[in-house]
UniProtKB/Swiss-Prot annotation:
Family of this protein: Belongs to the class-I aminoacyl-tRNA synthetase family.
Protein's name according to its UniProt entry: Arginine--tRNA ligase
GO molecular function, a single term: arginine-tRNA ligase activity
Gene: argS
EC assignment: 6.1.1.19
Length: 531
């Protein structure tokens, strides 16, 4: 809708301009401050320029009114224009709020948790944000691929193998074992150990077989992780292995050296990242000749940045904040534009249950598992919660608040609007097809506001994607549901003279809720549990 209005105005004025969304929709649906930017150029009073703009635009069919106010030009859309948009949306509902295919392409790498155990609630936040970003981007016409970087090398994988071996010895072979200071613990380790004991012969469980056991356990853990993600309706396009990049390490080091990106000191190879704004230089090859985690990660990012995507996006935990400068420095040394590597940080999550800290999982020791919270709340509610606040802000929520069946629970409140609309159609004995060509002739201001917001979904999605502020989608839905409930409570629908008109209004509202929820990975309810 906003795009159509912009094109209409640009055609008449012959220039680009800013089109704003005023908060008071009773005053205007859109406004432009163009007169202020032209005032310097034309050396005229912006009030006079605004009046000239009004004269040029007042005959546009899409506007009910075009008015100048304090230098701004305000536009109110006509019922006929909004009606045509609503009819088009309902007749082609599959494509509502979609955008034309865009040339810009993205590669999103997210989750990428070590394959040493199930996902915890911190992983879940980045996972749900990343999946929602993907859904919205694809809906808006972007090429948007997704990837999970599997850290299947290094000490943590050896520790996994050792932890499984010790658990087999203790719980299956009934031996006395001495656990090291660092190892993986929890019921999930014991469960996998029992699977390993059933898979291999008894004499397999010796120290020299730890590497083989570790690789076997890593695959088991990845299956658990993929199941955690699937339970939250998250499916990642590709899983790429850290070890698969080792053969490229030498070439990458050579390229870094050629561009002045590394130097040797104290028997180590250092990335000269401080030259590019990092707080200090970083070791990438240790004095034993082995690469650090950063070294492997540089190789992986070099590959990603060389695949032809316009932008590579990473979602990292907030504890990786200090990692951004060194990775961008490495990419710059390798000849890539670091502006094309975007890092989104997922902040910490604090869970409460009835006002008290949520209990840690017995299965994982000192973590709250994603699977446990999914089991308690369900995927739809958890997804809503994690999208409801900007990803880089701390999130605290009480699971019991989202079990309430009243307006204090936004998931319930929005679903109730959608279900109510289905009930009204059932009560009227009509379908969307029956009312698709009804005309909006008698809508009051509340009805017009509901209609405008229902048709404004695409603009909300574009704004949410471009600003990476996905919380704008649930904010939009809460407002839309509020507008609907207000109109529903104050107007008779079934049996009124305006029945078809109101039903058409409700149909476009329900369509917006359904699509916005689907892009959040949530299924809109047609019927509430108590109905």
């Amino acid at each position: 809708m906003k795009t159509l209005v912009y094109k209409e105005i640009k055609e008449k004025l012959g220039r680009d301009f800013i089109l704003e969304n005023p908060k008071n929709k009773n005053l205007a649906h859109f406004a432009t401050p163009l007169a202020f930017s032209l005032a310097k150029e034309l050396k005229q009073n912006p009030m006079i320029i605004a009046n000239d703009i009004v004269v040029k635009l007042k005959d546009c069919d899409c506007f009910e009114s075009v008015e100048a106010l304090n230098g701004y030009v305000n536009f109110k859309l006509s019922k006929a224009f909004l009606n045509s948009l609503a009819t088009q949306a309902l007749s082609d509902s599959e494509n509502f709020a979609k955008d034309d295919k865009k040339e810009q392409s993205f590669l999103l790498e997210y989750v990428s948790a070590n394959p040493t155990g199930p996902l915890h609630i911190g992983h879940a936040r980045g996972a749900i944000f990343g999946d929602t970003l993907t859904r919205v981007a694809r809906h808006l016409g972007y090429k948007f691929d997704t990837e999970y970087y599997v850290n299947d090398a290094g000490n943590q994988i050896y520790l996994l193998g050792l932890s499984i071996l010790l658990a087999v010895k203790e719980h299956c072979l009934k031996e006395q074992v001495q656990y090291p200071d660092e190892y993986y613990k929890g019921e999930y380790i014991i469960d996998v150990a029992k699977e390993a004991f059933a898979e291999f012969e008894k004499d397999f469980f010796v120290e020299e077989n730890i590497p083989q056991l570790a690789l076997w356990a890593k695959d088991k853990m990845l299956k658990i992780i993929k199941q955690n993600l699937a339970d939250a309706k998250i499916f990642i396009d590709a899983y790429v292995s850290e070890t698969s990049y080792y053969s490229e390490l030498e070439n990458t080091l050579k390229a870094l050296k050629e561009h002045g990106g590394t130097y040797e000191q104290d028997g180590k190879i250092w990335l000269a990242s401080s030259v590019k704004g990092d707080e200090k230089d970083r070791v990438i090859i240790k004095d034993d000749g082995k690469g650090t985690y950063l070294a492997a990660d540089i190789v992986y990012h070099k590959d990603k940045m060389s695949r032809g995507y316009d932008k590579c996006i990473n979602i990292w935990g907030a504890d990786h904040h200090g990692y951004i400068a060194r990775m961008k420095a490495a990419m710059e040394f390798l000849g890539h534009d670091s502006q094309n590597l975007e890092i989104i940080l997922a902040q910490m999550v604090s869970l409460l249950k009835n006002g008290e800290p949520y209990k840690m999982s017995k299965r994982a020791g000192n973590f709250i598992l994603m699977g446990d919270v999914l089991e308690e709340l369900g995927s739809d509610v958890l997804r809503y919660i994690f999208i409801s606040k900007k990803c880089d802000t701390h999130l605290e929520f009480d699971v019991d608040e989202f079990k309430k069946e009243d307006s204090s629970n936004p998931v319930y409140y929005i679903n109730y609007a959608h279900a109510r609309i289905h009930q009204v159609f059932a009560k009227a004995g009509k379908s969307v097809d029956d009312v698709m060509y009804a005309k909006f002739e008698s809508l009051n201001e509340d009805g017009m506001n509901l209609l405008f917001e229902s048709l404004n979904l695409k603009a909300v999605l574009n704004d949410a994607f471009e600003s990476r502020s996905l919380q704008k989608i649930p904010d939009y839905l809460k407002n839309l549901a509020s507008l609907f409930h207000k109109f529903y409570n104050e107007n008779k629908v079934v049996g009124s003279d305006n029945e078809d008109e109101f039903l058409k209004l409700f149909a476009i509202c329900a369509l917006s809720i359904k699509i916005a929820f689907a892009l959040m990975g949530i299924e809109a309810k047609n019927k509430m549990n108590h109905d």
